[in-house]
Amino acid sequence: TAQPKSLDETMLIHFLQRSSEELLEGRIVQAAELLAKKEFVLFIGEGTSKVLAEFGEIYFSSIYNLSASVSHLFSHPVSKLSEETAKKVGVIALSVSGETQKVRQNIDYFIEMGIDVIAITNSEKSTIAQLSTVTIPYYITTEKSSIADVTSQLPALFLIEKLAKTVSTMLNECP
């Protein structure tokens, strides 16, 4: 049985140092520009990413706009949105692996409806990243226990907060 190792603080410190680099900062700005034009933000994720989606919903709603998370991806009627409503929605998809089947299938629905999707994932080479309008990758070492992915979610948490504050700043600067 594989057991998780102790938390590698240096990996997280390195991520935080990289977060202000031009590439990552540019992706955050690009995603924020898309979200600033939306009236509603929908968060999706499975497993620990679902917990972060719920956090994102609360955090975004507190800072700048109405948002929600989808707890049960298949039972949510995303395909029932009108074209007009779809234009007002932005999706933030959270997935460490970027390969979560339920998340991928929902992204397909969103893309088909013309909804912009922002992926926050560990690699921009993942399927979810390739499907999304904008990808914000965080590139940290993945870790699995015998039953689950136990990769740190701190980078994704940080990116959700930074993205929300960037959108808020953009909207407050507009006349």
Please name every model-derived segment.
Residues 27-30, 171-175:
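Active-site phosphate/pyrophosphate-binding segments
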Residues 1-27:
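HTH-adjacent hinge/linker in prokaryotic transcriptional regulators
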Residues 36-172:
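Glycine-rich phosphate-binding loops that contact phosphosugars or nucleotide phosphates
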Residues 15-19, 34, 166:
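Residues that form generic nucleotide/phosphate-binding pockets
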Residues 29-32, 82:
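Short hydrophobic/charged patches on amphipathic alpha-helices used for structural packing
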